[in-house]
């Protein structure tokens, strides 16, 4: 989902959705490497999961070109990094039935336009960054600064190769094939489960291939409605896709969001400064001397669970509509909420100008939605179909508020700019003072020639920083002028005419054109909803504009046809490469085809501009802007490729074919004999329908199958061959349905909701929060003798003075912890990192039974992970729940005050 801010907004508004993953790992004292627990043991997170689905591109990208640590030296190291990441995720989730790995295949045209934009941007940014690095290096070297050697040109990894059809993706598929065999042959936790690999030759985005599998399985009569699903990926659309399944037990696992992660300077590889502030090696770069990152440098990334069952609880409260004149259905309202989120942003359509997630766009739409439901006595969507009459009402109300939305936005932006400008001036003035002191100190050096050299070097570095500071100060006003160069000015009258003239190059007042854009946008909304609920409605439809219309342009949309052409097919992998790659990435396409991207006489040379404009469109950063690239005409593209198909090598022809999913079963599986029999059939075209463990599909023979007791060679140097193989491989296809079949968006019979986490009106003060997944953990109890020991220990720490007590508790920190004087109590938690959410679960009894959350050391009255509940204002007990590991360590603390209330301990 094209909304980077969506997850941050969601985690702030609905914080109890997030919990930290528990891995039960140890660190090897000699090597410093992590030692993870045997995944055959019970899951330390208090729940056993059935199926783990990996959206592999979210793993491949950070493993091949990480932003916060040195990149792998070669492809072999990249593959090993991918293996290690899969192992770690497998160890956290510990699936007991299925592991499904899905790599992005060829995407629908609607998505290809975004992919094309990303890849052209990546090539442009790489070129510009190289030039900027060369310029800065030359400037620093001319001033005598010391620099590390330049990277060799061959060391650069082109991330654009992570696209279906490239040699890299073909090799990745072979390596994953080896990886699955290795784990099923050597790791007991893998031997009893099914593994499905959907590589880049299988059409479809990774997450949507996964959703197609889930959708088709749950439509089968023997599907378990209480299957525990875990989907790994960082895209916000995974949350929407999970909600769209209506499965009661659906969890997302993703990397913990850490803002301000330290990144090394591209010039000197140091931390604490950007490359434009670099002064080379040996000198103290600005802020680096006192650089204290929010996240420790080189810290291992942590994973979190996003519990969609808890999000459903929140949305039940958010979407509640009492006294409706018809029977209320939360499942229908949930589908409508998913649909409304598409207006804020998605990967297929630009967001409406009046809707910004940071401005409460979703809340605004929910308010308009409820008004619509009461008025029309019905919902917006039904299993992927849209009621345009009701959408028209919401768009009309939103359009009436557009003018005020734009004016309010401008006021906030002006206030922010004023504060930001004042902050920058203050920081640079402070910088100037420290630089003068540094320069003065550097001149007070003794007569030794070496010392004079060091002193002169420091003086030169200080002078260089001073010049940069002066230049920065002079550029402040220039930046303001650039930011104010907005020819549309949405906050002023006449913004519509200016918008369409500037963005679409059409004459002011051309109402017919505006209506046409709005109708295409509505068709796009219908296509996206079908994509989420039924699968791809059309492989060749796309929104043919770079910008969205205004909400007020949605007029008379009720009669628009929402049907799409049937029987469309995706591009082949190599054809897609020609549609999304810039000329700078031509090394990844067949050589005869690559000439079409650079030859001035090429009939499609206009598809590959060397330079293009990025319209900031009111944003601050280039990556937020709109890349104004020409849309690819697929008929022209295919026609231009016709003369070159017979020049493809055998390997390239193979990479250009659509493939099948692969199923892997070891001889420890109860279904081994059945699958082995299919794998040994003489005819590869013969397929057999299967049903086991609630999974249905069709299996077929594949040439990739390695004979039982045979040998599979390792494709990676340094890794062992698989000898005496015990794994069987077949092709796997999902159950087939008619093209007109409708997958109903509903709860299945016998589906059981997990224990409720949030309190409701009926629970009152009796509500007992559910920590993590397990609601049946033994409640801790402290006897009277324990209370006496606690009281005595706390009094000893306080030393008889003041009311301050703090501590680490029993399980962590050793003993009772260290007393803190005065009236301050300190819970055992690490607030050194500036999170959007805090995962330490600290529960205190709080008046009113509500919850208090800390965001970046702020307290907000919402339900959250740093949840504190107090029985009254004077209650002093705090219960720390850390290290969620089966029977939980319970750390009791005394916080402030001098009285102990033993009866409150007994409540736990």
Curated annotation (Swiss-Prot):
The modification Phosphoserine is found at residue 438. A zinc finger (CCHC-type) spans 263-280. Residues 432-454 have a biased composition (Polar residues). Residues 409-457, 821-908 are annotated as: Disordered. GO terms for biological process: mRNA processing; nuclear-transcribed mRNA catabolic process; termination of RNA polymerase II transcription. The keyword Nuclease applies. Keywords: Exonuclease, Hydrolase, Metal-binding, mRNA processing, Nuclease, Nucleus, Phosphoprotein, Transcription, Transcription regulation, Transcription termination, Zinc, Zinc-finger. One of its GO terms (molecular function) is 5'-3' RNA exonuclease activity. It is found in: Nucleus. InterPro entries: 5_3_exoribonuclease, Xrn1_helical, Xrn1_N, Xrn2/3/4. The keyword ATP-binding does not apply. Its main location: nucleus. PANTHER family: 5'-3' EXORIBONUCLEASE 2, 5'->3' EXORIBONUCLEASE. Belongs to the 5'-3' exonuclease family. XRN2/RAT1 subfamily. Interacts with cuff and Rai1; the interaction with cuff may inhibit its role in RNA degradation. This is 5'-3' exoribonuclease 2 homolog.
């Amino acid at each position: 989902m094209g909304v980077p801010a969506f997850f941050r907004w969601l985690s702030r508004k609905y914080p109890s959705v997030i919990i930290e993953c528990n891995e039960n790992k140890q660190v090897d004292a000699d090597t410093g490497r992590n030692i993870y627990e045997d995944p055959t043991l019970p899951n330390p997170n208090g729940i056993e999961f059935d199926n783990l689905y990996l959206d592999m591109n979210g793993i491949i990208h950070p493993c091949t070109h990480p932003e916060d640590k040195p990149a792998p030296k070669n492809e072999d190291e990249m593959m090993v990094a991918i293996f290690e990441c899969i192992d770690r995720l497998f160890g956290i989730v510990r699936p007991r039935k299925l592991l499904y790995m899905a790599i992005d295949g060829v995407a629908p045209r609607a998505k290809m336009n975004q992919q094309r934009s990303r890849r052209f941007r990546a090539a442009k940014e790489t070129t510009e960054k190289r030039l900027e690095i060369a310029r800065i290096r030359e400037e620093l070297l001319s001033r005598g600064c010391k620099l590390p050697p330049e990277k060799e040109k061959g060391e650069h990894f082109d991330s654009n190769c992570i696209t279906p059809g490239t040699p890299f993706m073909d090799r990745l598929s072979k390596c994953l094939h080896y990886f699955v065999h290795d784990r099923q042959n050597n790791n007991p936790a893998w031997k009893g489960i099914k593994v499905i690999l959907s590589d880049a030759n299988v059409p479809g985005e990774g997450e949507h291939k996964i959703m197609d599998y889930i959708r088709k399985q749950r439509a089968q009569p023997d599907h378990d409605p209480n299957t525990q699903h875990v989907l790994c990926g960082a895209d916000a659309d995974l949350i929407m896709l999970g909600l769209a399944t209506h499965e009661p037990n659906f969890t997302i696992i993703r990397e913990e969001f850490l803002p301000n992660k330290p990144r090394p300077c591209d010039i000197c590889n140091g931390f604490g400064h950007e490359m434009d502030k670099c002064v080379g090696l040996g000198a103290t770069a600005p802020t680096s001397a006192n650089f204290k990152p929010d996240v420790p440098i080189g810290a291992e990334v942590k994973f979190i669970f996003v519990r969609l069952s808890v999000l459903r609880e929140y949305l039940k409260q958010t979407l509640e509509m009492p006294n409706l004149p018809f029977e209320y259905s939360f499942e229908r309202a949930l589908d409508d909420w998913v649909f409304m989120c598409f207006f804020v942003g998605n990967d297929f359509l630009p967001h409406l100008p009046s809707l910004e997630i940071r401005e409460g766009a979703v809340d605004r739409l929910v308010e308009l939605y409820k008004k619509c439901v009461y008025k029309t006595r019905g919902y917006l969507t039904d299993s992927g179909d849209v009621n345009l009459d009701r959408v028209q009402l919401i768009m009309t109300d939103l359009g009436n508020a557009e003018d005020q939305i734009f004016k309010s936005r401008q006021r906030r932006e002006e206030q922010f700019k004023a504060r930001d400008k004042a902050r920058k001036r203050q920081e640079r003035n402070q910088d100037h003072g420290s630089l003068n002191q540094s320069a003065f100190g550097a001149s007070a050096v003794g007569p030794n020639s070496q010392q004079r050299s060091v002193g002169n070097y420091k003086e030169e570095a200080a002078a260089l920083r001073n010049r940069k500071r002066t230049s920065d100060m002079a550029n402040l006003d220039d930046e303001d002028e650039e930011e104010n160069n907005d020819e549309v000015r949405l906050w002023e009258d006449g913004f519509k005419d200016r918008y369409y003239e500037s963005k679409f190059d059409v004459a002011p007042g051309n109402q017919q054109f505006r209506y046409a854009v709005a109708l295409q946008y509505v068709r796009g909304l219908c296509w996206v909803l079908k994509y989420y609920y039924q699968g791809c409605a059309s492989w060749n439809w796309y929104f043919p504009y770079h910008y969205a219309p205004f909400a007020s342009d949605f007029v008379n949309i009720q009669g628009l046809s929402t049907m799409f052409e049937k029987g469309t097919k995706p591009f082949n992998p190599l054809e897609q490469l020609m549609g999304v790659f810039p000329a700078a990435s031509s090394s990844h396409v067949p050589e005869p085809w690559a000439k079409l991207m650079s030859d001035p006489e090429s009939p499609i040379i206009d598809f590959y501009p060397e330079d293009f404009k990025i319209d900031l469109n009111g944003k601050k950063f280039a990556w937020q802007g709109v890349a104004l690239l020409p849309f690819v005409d697929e008929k022209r593209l295919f026609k231009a490729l016709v003369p070159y198909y017979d020049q493809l090598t055998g390997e390239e022809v193979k990479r250009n074919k659509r493939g099948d999913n692969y199923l892997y079963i070891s001889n420890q599986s109860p279904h081994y004999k059945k699958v082995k029999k299919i794998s040994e059939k003489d005819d590869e075209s013969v397929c057999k329908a299967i049903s086991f463990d609630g999974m249905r599909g069709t299996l077929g023979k594949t040439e990739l199958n390695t004979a039982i007791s045979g040998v599979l060679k390792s494709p990676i140097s340094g890794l062992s061959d698989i000898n005496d193989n015990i794994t069987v491989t077949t092709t796997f296809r999902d159950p087939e349905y008619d093209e007109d079949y409708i997958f109903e968006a509903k709860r299945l019979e016998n589906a059981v909701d997990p224990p409720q986490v949030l309190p409701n009106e009926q629970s009152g003060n009796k509500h007992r929060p559910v920590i993590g997944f397990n609601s049946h953990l033994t409640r801790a109890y402290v006897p009277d003798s324990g209370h006496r020991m606690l009281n005595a220990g706390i009094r000893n720490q306080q030393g008889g003075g003041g009311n301050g007590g703090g501590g680490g508790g029993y399980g962590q920190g050793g003993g009772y912890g260290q007393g803190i004087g005065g009236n301050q109590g300190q819970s055992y938690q690490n607030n050194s990192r500036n999170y959007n959410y805090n995962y330490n679960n600290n529960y205190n009894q709080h008046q009113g039974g509500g919850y208090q959350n800390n965001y970046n050391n702020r307290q907000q009255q919402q339900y959250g992970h740093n949840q504190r509940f107090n029985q009254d204002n004077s209650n002093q007990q705090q219960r720390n729940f850390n290290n969620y590991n089966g029977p939980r360590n319970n750390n009791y603390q005394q916080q402030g005050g001098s009285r102990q209330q033993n009866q409150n301990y007994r409540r736990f």
